[in-house]
Amino acid sequence: MLRIRRDLVDAIVAHARRDHPDEACGVIAGPDDGTDRPERFVPMVNAARSPTFYEFDSGDLLRLYREMDANDEKPVVIYHSHTATEAYPSRTDIKLAQEPFAHYVLVSTRDPEDYELRSYRIVDGEVTEEPVEVVESYMFANTGSDDVPDA
């Protein structure tokens, strides 16, 4: 399951709308501590500048991975948009998926009034859709706690 903050979902959708009709792409980095928590939104430039394909700029991607390494982070979410189709990985998306522990998030912007956001694990060409839980904060997400600290 992907648990992700509302502000990060809003940022993905805004990026996808801004780059439409081209596919948007980016990464959400998080601590490399086993929490699987997306934290730092990193919109990237689609080097392909295409409505049907995305490609990270190799120099930008190298800089991002060096930055994540220096910050003890990992790519928790790798996202991109589909501008005219559903939010499901294409054969190319599946072939290029190289991070077996990342959540691959797709957002469809084919409807100008709404969006579809889905998350997948892609490992060795196998696509598994996973539930997405959108939360306001990770502080109390799925703990059974309320928003009021104990006295």
Predicted regions and their residues:
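Conserved beta-strand-loop surface patch within small alpha/beta domains used
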Residues: 1-75, 84-151
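Metallo-beta-lactamase
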Residues: 81
